[in-house]
Amino acid sequence: EAQLDRFFMQVDVDYPDLEGERQIIVNTTSTIVPEPVQVMDAKALIEAQGLVRHVPVGESVAEAILELVRAGRPETSDIEDVKKNVSWGPGPRATQALMLGVRARSVIEGRLAPSIDDVLALVHPILRHRMALTFSARAEGVTLRSIIDRLCDRIA
């Protein structure tokens, strides 16, 4: 649990299509070594990281993040599906990751501040590796996706 919690988010990458996989085998098994292209220097990267931390977050977005993460904890949740099916829920790092994630997403999309839509867009990749289902929930076919969707109903 603790090791997984250190990852900012879990991004699932699908298999490449046929042409993409063809490019992979050609590019990675030949003697030609591609030249990397620098897109920004270290200073610009640090400045971008600092910029994200200065993006203002409205109280409604901050409260939605807190509500969502805290409702995912079986010990304190008032959602029956969470109490019954979740063995451990997201900790404070999930709250931090969502806050930074929504700020970064708003910057990337050219907006001055994050919205509830940013929270909803990032909640699955940020929470799914920070929660675990009980054995009985898994046996019954309950999924983390369905539990997280239930959490999203609270703020949507």
Regions found by a protein language model. Give the residues of each.
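Conserved C-terminal "switch" segment of AAA+ ATPases
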Residues: 10-82, 108-112, 116, 137, ...
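C-terminal engagement/docking regions of AAA+ P-loop ATPases
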Residues: 74-156
